[in-house]
């Protein structure tokens, strides 16, 4: 029986948090020869800091076969879809200044609205991984990748982009920051629901040891590791 398909993702916001553990994540993934999707943070009140930091200090350390995507914070809680669409385009344009064309996306704090779906498609996003990345996830939300509705991002529909939700079980999200023991329970429970597993982590937490344990555990299960965009391209 084939093992699970796994996408590891990193929320890259360390410029705003004062601590950055990119090197440990790179080390763990290189030692295990697995790719990762790095989602570069752009925030409404400080759009450039994270991208500049990564460009100057870290992008040259991340293997070319990893993926670079966009992580966007709607800081003011703007509810007007036109304003949010403008922010999505700003995020794309900032990454474009550094020769990055993102096709993977995540909104901070699970803040994905229906009007965002079309705006994401318009800038070339192929896969969103917002659902499951925060504390809240509707119980009836799909656990495997799906095409969302244009009117409800947590329901299946006719949108062109995919949503690849982060593993989320009994109110616990699949983030490596929480430690291997917590994550092992999430992984085991999620794999009873889907053989596709998306896990998250943040770059402001020292995840090297936890990540190495998670990768080793999943390899024992015969897991195949991929990036978010490659994952949905195979569906």
Identify the residue ranges that each predicted region occupies.
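Short, well-ordered alpha-helical microsegments
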Residues: 18, 113-117, 207-211
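Active-site-adjacent pocket scaffolds in enzyme catalytic domains
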Residues: 107-194
